[in-house]
Amino acid sequence: MRGSNLFQLTLALLLSLVAAEDGYNGWLRYAPVSCDLHCRQALPSHIVLLNSTKGSPIETAGRELKAGFQSILSTNLTFHPFQCDSSASILVATLDEYRQKCRDINLPELDPDGFWLQSEGDTVRILGNNARGALYGAYEYLAMVAQRNFSRVAYTTNPHAPIRWVNQWDNMDGSIERGYGGASIFFKDGTVVEDMAPVEQYARLLASIRINAIVVNNVNANATLLLPENMKGLGRIADACRPYGVQIGISLNFASPESLGGLETYDPLDPGVIAWWQNITDSLYTYVPDMAGYLVKADSEGQPGPDTYNRTLSQGANLFARALQPHGGVLMYRAFVYNDNLNESDWKADRAKAAVEYFKDLDGQFYENVVVQIKYGPIDFQVREPTSPLFANLYQTNTAIELEVSQEYLGQQCHLVYLPPLWKTVLDFDLRVDHKPSMVRDILSGQRFNRTLGGWAAVVNVGTNRTWLGSHLAMSNLYAYGRLAWSPTDDSEQILKDWTRLTFGQNRQVIDTIADMPMTSWPAYENYTGNLGIQTLTDILYTHYGPNPATQDNNGWGQWTRADHNSVGMDRTISNGTGYTGQYPEEVARLYESLETTPDDLVLWFHHVPWTHRLHSGLTVIQHFYNAHYAGSEAAHGFIRQWESLKGLIDRERYEAMRSRLVYQAGHSIVWRDAINNFYYNMTGIPDVAGRVGHHPWRIEAESMRLDGYQTYTVSPFEAASNTTAIITTSNSTTGTARTTIKAPSGVYDIGVNYYDLYGGQSKWTLSVGDKVVGQWLGDMEHQSLGHTPSIYLDGHSATRITFHGVVVRQGDQLKIVGEANGVEPAPVDYVVLLPPGVVD
């Protein structure tokens, strides 16, 4: 589909906004803005394209400009033949073509993908270093117009780094590992899908934020992607992305020569293996002549790699880099290599040290088209980690940072968490290599160590959900990733406001409210999950979603907290611990080696301290835990009130979808708060000085009610239930009733019911007070759009809350819950809470 057909598709997508706002267009809604007569007199009336061959990004730029002006301003721009100095026009060209066809123009230097934008009233010129840069300039101009910014501008902008990629962890069967927004848009049933429309729309969104490549499949790769029919399918994906200047790459399974090719080895130094990969690579480039390259995960979490044959990681990486070199491809090699069977009884054992231990001595041994892809922290996308020291240990090797837009450990898009402030703690961190300024962002750009290749990768994992990520507000993270990959000094809040204007419109209250909520969301989530550098206290052995702090310890995965009755934290000092601090340059090592100079927010990452240790804040560690978890949950409840203030200012579909998600988050934040506080109170025996932990005067424990057809059930882990116990029906096909007499004073209450919504069943509950039914609900979250990894157990993942507001209660009324079991779900209930107005518990 090309030319006018593509324009009609783009315009149809935009006009569909009149009927519905489902999020499919993201920040490219091109919603109408006001433009009076004076404003319209200063608008261009036609588009002039230079060398707009079919399917080129410049042709795409023209199509986007035409559709955008039609949608935003109801203005029909016409295409005119090329003229060098056409007035009342938008001219789009590459700089070289413009200079050849028109005249030389004195501009600041343009790097690959960079562009120059000049807007002077009705005349706009967009010149790119290449066609992709010209398209980026068109999107930049449209973003200005969509925000009702018609100012005169003239500036050049260049990318921070050449690599600005996204990674998809899509599997060949159509599932997505750590994906929370539906099934794959690329694969189904072992092959590439036929419908490329979502792929094209995804490429369009990526191009608008200046992302230049997608790795389309999971790093835990399936070798069948390399079958001829799937190579042909990759060609179709590339064809859909190419008009937007987005290249594709693929992840490889290191053992493919053996598992797919029938060889007896996958030794990277074996001539037969080398020849096999060269043949595969050459074949891929016949289908995808502009393929960006490969991504490889090796010797990690069960994935095969060069270590099988006692070969180095650089020898493994160079195997693929050599095959890519004739085609100009790049090999991204993940630094996520570690031993997942560590011995916790060894005080010196430390997973955080793995990346430097594996890669530092190989510095300078990687081919020039190899980029080592390094997670922002040394463990795994935690709510807070120190900057990976590997960035300071590779001087002669290209590097890229790996971020995660998909909220694997951070609420899985069911919790609002705006990630740029977290990313900024790493990007802006000064590693002080050789006692010189060494910002991580300057290492990524190549500026610090004089490298020409490097940059950015983010695990995104969009899916078939119309919101792409499962949540409207989560798309702010994808938008911000593109903005920061282009210009990492941009302000997180300003990026958010730009995204809000493009996504939700120009209303000042909407902009201010949505800017405030996400900007406080990461601190809130950190508060009610894991504090002081202890990591996200989620279940690392199961879903990576709900609370289960015990899973951090007593296994070989190395995400230990070393918490016991007396003390907590990892001692990573040189003097008495694992020696991890010594992997940093001297100034940073000295900062973290001392308990006195280590910031509170990382104290448990670097030091093992008593629970009664006083922080710089003056609080003890345990009291900080208690306070933070209460504060975080309070903040999550505040998000609901803030969002509800926007009712009528946002279209109903997106308003209701986001409100239900925020209500869920608030309820789950209570689950998190109580689970973590109860776990550590039980461990330490140290009470909360404010008397909150374990004290819930508004609650009625389900097991204390009169039960008929229900029985008590001891929940595991214990902290996933308010009083360690819940109730379940006596069988999975019966009905249970729980009754109690209300002792609270008569009045108006919000009544919350904490229950468990298990995967594989749809129980039905009915809540009554007196002779009135307050509400009914189903345990059907797996059929809603929440998307988080489900659980078949009563635990911190399945625990949730439903709240009925403004219920009139009389003292002495009977409160009754009737639960009808279904499937594997025995209508489980934890407790009921009667909350006076303004109380959170």
Curated annotation (Swiss-Prot):
Entry EC number(s): 3.2.1.139
UniProt cross-references to CDD domains, sorted A to Z: CBM6-CBM35-CBM36_like
Keywords (A to Z) from UniProt: Carbohydrate metabolism, Glycoprotein, Glycosidase, Hydrolase, Polysaccharide degradation, Secreted, Signal, Xylan degradation
Record's signal peptide: 1-20
Keyword Transport: no
The species this protein was found in: Aspergillus tubingensis
pH dependence: Optimum pH is 4.5-6.0.
Thermal behaviour (record text): Optimum temperature is 70 degrees Celsius.
Superkingdom assignment: Eukaryota
Protein name, as recorded: Alpha-glucuronidase A
Reactions listed under catalytic activity: an alpha-D-glucuronoside + H2O = D-glucuronate + an alcohol
Residues glycosylated per entry: N51, N76, N149, N222, N279, N310, N343, N450, N465, N527, N576, N682, N723, N732
GO cellular component: extracellular region
GO terms, biological process: xylan catabolic process
Record field: transmembrane: none
Induction: By xylan and xylose but not by glucuronic acid.
Coiled-coil spans in chain: none
